Amino acid sequence: MVEVVLDRHRLEDQRHFETAIHATPEVLDCWAIGGRIDYLMRVAAPSMAAYQDFMEGLRQVGLGIDQYYSLIVTKSVKSNSPIPLSASRQR
């Protein structure tokens, strides 16, 4: 997982980042987040060296990334859990 903070928060900067990320196969998922970070991405790489190269490449192509924080998943505790029907009916 990668937490991303953009250097600017204009709509055009967000759209530029999102368009580029959408076309990037290494990024499996990307969510816009409210709070101290702007985006949370799930990234796949065959090795740590490949991951580092990928992230440095993202910083070099002008996507407006100010900072990024790498979070390494060590164990899956719960994954792909559907929303219970009772929760979806409460809308």
Locations of regions flagged by a protein language model:
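A compositional/biophysical signature of low hydrophobicity enriched in polar/charged and small residues
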Residues: 1-91
